[in-house]
Amino acid sequence: MSFSGFVAVGCGAAVGAWLRWWLAILLNPIFPTLPLGTLTANLLGGWLMGLAMGFFGHFESLPPEMRLLLMTGFLGGLTTFSTFSAETATLISHEQFGWTAVSVAAHVIGSVLMTLVGAAMMGMVLKR
């Protein structure tokens, strides 16, 4: 582990976490049963991960610190499996099983689909 990689991950994670916090403040009060800030962070993070996968797959010679900054740091700080898990556990404890299913599907399937969309979009951009 290099010092530059350590700094890249830390800086990216801080910015990603700040954005996730801002999304939670802005969007979670709109529909508390399915906190939209958390969902937005995970869907946006999935899409950005797809873009990054396509970009870094194409430009393999870029410094590894760029990948660490964006993918490991920023997107790791932005997306949140732990908050999603806590929100899902809360839905289950309140016996809101329908909303639990909606939440799990939206986060898991939605994030994977957004990653695929992001990768496809970057692939189209890079083919131009």
Predicted regions mapped to residue ranges:
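Membrane-interface helix-loop junctions in multi-pass transporters/channels
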Residues: 1-128
